[in-house]
């Protein structure tokens, strides 16, 4: 626990803004919407194009998987921020999130009214890995959980661990329990001020170390007196697994922060050299469109002039000029989005996100040491 807390505290001196901007891409796996796209890994470029299509410009040729992932990233990000800001969470708040996540399946929306189970046969729970409580108990269990989420009886990491495990144990919905349960981790850490922008990829670590995760949850679900030595040991085992994941997530976030800082330094050098060669002697003003685009690039690696206008309030001509200038210097490249339209993208950011996600999927956090343990995008080609 102390190691995890120290690792998170070290993030306080990092460029948290950058980490917040790219966190939604690292948490891409949490946005997988339904079983028909489970196991498909849309790459960061396709997801960024899908986000662009949602907000600024229609993009042709997008896969349904990329669009679904982009939509659910927006849903989870918005819901987490909303849940983190309310004084008292209610079961209805969690139900609203679940309904938004399974909007394409009205028959699976809301609190379940039938028994469900995890693992084993689809027809009976005899070989299930876990059988959640009966539907008749859900109202009381969910009120108890949201009351706990609204308080501060334990430290943030312990609270996030217990809330996540209890929610996964209750399994209150017909579908979407995993995604809601993972969102609760970020909700707690944000509510308690530990990670103001929900940047820690905790659930990716738990997914990578799935055997430890499942063993920890199983220990937490000890059937017997909760205050017995066995019950306490089970809770402690789960909290240890979770705290270890938080510590690793914070350490990997620091690695990403250092890599982003290196990228920014490279961009600054490329900008200065490009302007020198173009005879632009004066440095751009801090409020110039060029610098504003560079500032937001980690979070918006694919953009159009309309994106720049929406984000930074520049003129359309100023936005177009800034993007063209950055492309001229090799910081951005262009990508077709259909019908003669083009967008600008940062290969550096997209490649970095892919490399980091692959590393997070490796039990050793290094694919040269151990391969990814779940489906991830292909390694980007060498070079810029």
Residue ranges and their predicted role:
Residues 1-384:
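FIC/Doc superfamily catalytic core
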């Amino acid at each position: 626990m102390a190691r995890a807390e120290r690792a998170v505290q070290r993030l306080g001196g990092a460029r948290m803004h950058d980490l917040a901007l790219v966190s939604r891409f690292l948490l891409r796996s949490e946005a997988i919407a339904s079983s028909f796209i489970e196991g498909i890994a849309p790459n960061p470029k396709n997801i960024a194009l899908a986000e662009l299509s949602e907000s600024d410009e229609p993009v042709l040729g997008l896969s349904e998987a990329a669009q679904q992932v982009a939509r659910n990233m927006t849903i989870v990000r918005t819901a987490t921020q909303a849940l983190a800001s309310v004084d008292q969470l209610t079961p209805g708040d969690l139900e609203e999130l679940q309904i938004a996540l399974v909007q394409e399946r009205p028959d699976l929306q809301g609190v379940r009214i039938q028994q469900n189970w995890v693992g084993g046969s689809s027809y009976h729970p005899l070989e299930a890995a876990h059988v959640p409580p009966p539907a008749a108990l859900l109202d009381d269990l969910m009120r108890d959980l949201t009351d706990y989420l609204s308080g501060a009886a334990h430290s943030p990491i312990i609270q996030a661990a217990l809330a996540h495990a209890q929610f996964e144990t209750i399994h209150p919905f017909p579908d979407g329990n995993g995604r809601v349960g993972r969102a609760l981790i970020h909700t707690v850490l944000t509510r308690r001020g530990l990670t103001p922008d929900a940047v820690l990829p905790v659930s990716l670590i738990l997914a990578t170390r799935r055997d430890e995760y499942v063993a920890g949850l199983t220990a937490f679900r000890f059937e017997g007196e909760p205050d017995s030595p066995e019950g306490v040991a089970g809770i402690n085992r789960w909290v240890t697994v979770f705290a270890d994941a938080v510590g690793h997530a914070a350490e990997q976030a620091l690695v990403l922060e250092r890599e982003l800082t290196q990228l920014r330094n490279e961009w600054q050098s490329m900008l200065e050299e490009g302007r020198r060669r173009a005879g632009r002697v004066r440095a751009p003003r801090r409020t110039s469109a060029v610098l504003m685009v560079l500032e937001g690039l980690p979070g918006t690696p694919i953009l159009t002039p309309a994106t720049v206008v929406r984000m930074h309030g520049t003129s359309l001509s100023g936005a177009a000029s800034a993007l063209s200038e950055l492309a001229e210097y090799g910081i951005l490249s262009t990508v077709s989005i259909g019908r003669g339209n083009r967008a600008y993208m940062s290969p550096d950011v997209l490649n970095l996100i892919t490399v980091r996600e692959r590393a997070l999927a490796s039990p050793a956090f290094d694919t040269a040491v151990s391969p990814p343990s779940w489906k991830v995008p292909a390694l980007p080609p060498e070079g810029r």
